[in-house]
Amino acid sequence: MLTANGYNAAQLAMPKAIRGIPNFTDITPAQLTDIRTAFAEAGIEISVLSCYQDLSNPDTAIRENAVAAVCRALHYQKAVGAKHVGSESACRDLTEDEKAATLPLLTDSILRIVEQAAKIDACFALEPVFVHTLGTVEKLRTLKEAVADHDHFHIIFDPVNVLTAADVPRQAAFWPAWCEVIGKDLACVHM
């Protein structure tokens, strides 16, 4: 279906898109092989293997489970031949105070994920969203400086997720700022 419509790449959310995979913990090696084979035969690159988790949750147990899920997905990335495992920084809308309070938690999560990615030569990609912990170009710059690993940490850029009504009049400066900070660490663009 994708190839017939002119597509050569996709972001894959296995539990949502593939029957027989109800979650990230019950995936078999045979299923991963079947996925890799099907995409390769169709000539479709899996640009991002989705594993969207709440990586900045203030509840330590929830956040640790989220980090573990992403780290597990990094192994799946290798098995299915995906370029990245991707997530957003949160799973809910946050106030400005909550965003500030959860940025150190997100940074800790990303550092642990990227450490694991480096160990197995995988790559994690984070998607900024304005209403989540990581939603401004300044916070992205700070996070990228803290992580400092261009081989194992990239960015999924969805312009709709970061543009607010207040930013509309200043788009001439807004978009170049995002592109400058993302730089060569772009995993993909959501259109």
Describe each model-derived feature in a short phrase.
Residues N5, I44, V80, D151, ...:
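Structured loop/turn residues at beta-strand edges in well-structured enzyme cores
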Residues A13-A17, C51-D54, A90-R92, E127-V131, ...:
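Active-site beta-loop-alpha junctions enriched in small/polar residues
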Residues M1-A17, V80-K83:
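Catalytic domains of carbohydrate-active enzymes, especially glycoside hydrolases
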Residues N8-L12, I46-C51, V85-S87, F124-L126, ...:
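Hydrophobic faces of well-ordered beta-strands that scaffold small-molecule active sites
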Residues T33-D34, A38-E41, L55-F157:
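Active-site acidic/histidine proton-transfer and metal-coordination neighborhood
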Residues F24-D34:
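Aromatic- and glycine-enriched glycan-recognition loops and surfaces
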Residues V168-M191:
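Glycoside hydrolase catalytic-domain groove-lining segments
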Residues I18-D26, A165-A173:
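Short, flexible/disordered intra-domain loops and linkers
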